[in-house]
C-alpha cells in the first residue's frame, strides 16, 4: 500500500508579496512534515526556482515550480512549469500557455472578489470560467482567513465538474503554511501529478492559532490590495 503524502500547492515568498524568503518557506514546510510544496508567486517563478534549489541541497522536501498568473479574467495557478507565464492574457489563453509547457492549470479561489482595484483589475478568481475551460484541478480549500464561503462555493462547483480537488494555503506568512493541504497517494511530485490527473487527491484544512491570525492581520494591513472583502 502506498503511503499518503501531504502537499501545500499555493504559497508566496518575498519574490512577490509574501513575507517568508524561499529558504524560510522550505525550512518551515520541512519542519511541519510536508512532502511536496508548490511555490506560486505572483507572475514570477524566481521564488520557486530558489526554493527548489535550496530544498534539493538541504532537505528531503520536493518543490514543484509554480506561478500564480494574473490573467485578465482572474488568478490561475500554473504547476509543473519551466518558464514564466505572461500575465494579462485571457483565462483561456493562460490555460493554453500552461498546457503548452506541459504544466497543470488550477482554478484557485475561483469565487473570490475584491472591492479594491489591483494591477489585474477587480477580479481575483476566474468564477464560472472554471467550468468552461480545461482546468486540471480546482482549489476547494484555501486557508486565507474569511474564505469559508468561497471554499464552499468552489467545492460545490467541483462536485459537478469531477475535477481533482486541491488544498493550498495561499500562504503569505509562515503561520499559514500547511493550513490548507492536499493529500495524495505517494510522496513525490510525480505521484502528486498522477493523483491530480486521475482525480485521487483529497483537500483538507486546519484551523489557525490565535497568533497566526494576528500575524495574518498584520500582513493584510501592509498589503491592502490583497485583502478579501468578506
What are these regions (language model features)?
Residues 1-15, 19-27, 32, 46-49, ...:
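Charged catalytic cores and adjacent phosphate/nucleic-acid-binding surfaces used
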Residues 60, 101-106, 110-111:
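Short beta-strand/loop segments at the ligand-binding rim of alpha/beta enzyme cores
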